[in-house]
Swiss-Prot record:
Pfam families membership: ATP-synt_DE, ATP-synt_DE_N
Membrane protein topology class: Peripheral membrane protein
Protein name: ATP synthase epsilon chain, chloroplastic
Keywords, comma-separated and alphabetical: ATP synthesis, CF(1), Chloroplast, Hydrogen ion transport, Ion transport, Membrane, Plastid, Thylakoid, Transport
Domain of life: Eukaryota
GO CC term, one of those recorded: proton-transporting ATP synthase complex
Entry keyword RNA-binding: no
Length: 137
């Protein structure tokens, strides 16, 4: 029993295929979705999207957006999305270190907010990689 998942960014279609289950990071916590889920629209936080295919899970880093669930279709509109398999681990770790350093030297409210967002994005990318490695091991 499957349903269609479509993940879109402003520039591309990241995913458009049948899945068995997903777990989303919403602004109010995580939500699991199976076939015949009740209709819902929700805001998405910067976080991990877990996608269950037949017998394996895939992980994707989402950079915030919205999801619409209904009629066995889920449409996810996000600022950006990356499959964990497409993320370079060394580059992601380096980006995380830079984001942490930028937060430490941020001055003023605006710089602090921007640095916090960059740090959350960087942590999400690293988390996606770590979760994928754990599933493989």
């Amino acid at each position: 029993m499957t349903f269609n998942l479509c993940v879109l960014t402003p520039n591309r279609i990241v995913w458009d295929s049948e899945v068995k289950e997903i777990i989303l990071s919403t602004n109010s916590g995580q939500i699991g979705v199976l076939q015949n889920h009740a209709p819902i629209a929700t805001a998405l936080d910067i976080g991990i999207l877990r996608i269950r295919l037949k017998d394996r899970w895939l992980t994707m880093a989402l950079m915030g957006g919205f999801a619409r669930i209904g009629n066995n279709e889920i449409t996810i509109l996000v600022t950006d999305a990356e499959s964990a398999s497409d993320i370079n681990p060394q580059e992601a770790q380096q980006t995380l270190q830079i984001a942490e350093a930028n937060l430490n030297k941020a001055e003023g409210k605006r710089e602090t907010i921007e640095a916090n967002l960059s740090l959350r994005r960087a942590k999400t990318r690293v988390e996606a990689i770590v979760e994928t490695i754990k599933r493989i091991s």
